[in-house]
Amino acid sequence: MASMKAAILNAPDGTPTYGDFPDPKLTEGRQIATMVAAGIHPIVRALASGKHYASKGAWPMIPGIDTVARTEDGALIYSGFIDPPYGTFAERMAVPAAMRFELPDGADPVQVAGGMNPGLSSWLPLIARKKELEKLGTVLILGVTGMAGLLAVQNAFSLGAERVIGTGRNAEGLLQAAKRQAETVTLTGDRQTDGAAIAKTFGSNAPCLILDFVWGEPAEAAFDALSYAEFKATDNVDIAYLEIGSMAGAEASLPASLLRSRRIRISGSGLGSASLAEILAQVPVYMKLIAERRVEVPTRVFPLSKIAEAWASNESGRRSVVVPG
């Protein structure tokens, strides 16, 4: 059987190794494509650990969920949804015809591979909220120092947000958010202190949307801030809270009084909460945003043969991207 070079994970919570793996089989509705660039996103690590709700729990496996690849007809495309145990950290993969999005002229494959997954995580709820309200006021981002958070700042402003407030602990990440015009709040890990700091930054203006990439204590601090902030025109306060990630903890304590005292809607945003049609409709839209450099995606590039080094690299605010070699 023919084989290819790939990143191979033999057990959960391990480190992928560079080696030979059987070539993917060509099945109906799929075509063979060659990897050009693929991002190591947090969800890639979570799926590989076997602990994510969407993990298939089968090893050995090739990690990776999305890619920029070149098809046999020469087209440069963004794709994903590779059938396990295959993934995108491989020389070749069988991509579904329904998930074939040609890159716009001038698009940098590394930027697209690094930015589509983290960028869409905020782009989808932002455009949905703007459609509801017609315009975006204040947007609060919990976990602004990571790649998804920094892209959320840029996404919010590109959609006309009046203010963006970002919270986090990493000083360099907060500086990068501030350079992108976000107002920042440095978290201490103390719920009361952090809640007061967020409330002070709100001032009298309630957020129309909260994008939460971390959950845990930062979410609890935000709940407290929403509870005792003195917003003007309280009859018009309408808050949408989107839980996207749980880097700071799987659980958070939600005061019942907050649900009674504020008009607030708390929901999740993930693989099971948005329709596939809604997600796919925004793929070319967001790719165009990246191609036009309207959002910047900080990346660090590794050859596939250095997958162990790439996997170990987890630089805040910079996405590791695997390329052939």
Model-predicted segments: where are they?
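C-terminal hydrophobic helical "lid"/dimerization subdomain
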Residues: 2, 230-231, 276-325
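Phosphate-coordination loops involved in phosphoryl transfer and adenosine-cofactor binding
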Residues: 3, 135-138, 161, 207, ...
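Glycine-rich beta-strand-centered segment in the early N-terminal region that forms part
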Residues: 22-41, 48-87
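NAD(P)H dinucleotide-binding glycine-rich loop of Rossmann-like/cofactor-binding domains
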Residues: 65-66, 76-144
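Short, glycine/polar-rich helix-capping loops at beta-to-alpha or helix-loop-helix junctions
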Residues: 88-89, 168-176, 251-256
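Mid-domain Rossmann-like dinucleotide-binding core that forms the NAD(H)/NADP(H) cofactor-binding site
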Residues: 115-191
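Adenosine-nucleotide cofactor-binding segment
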Residues: 157-231, 284
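Glycine-rich phosphate-binding loop and adjacent beta-alpha segment
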Residues: 215-292, 325
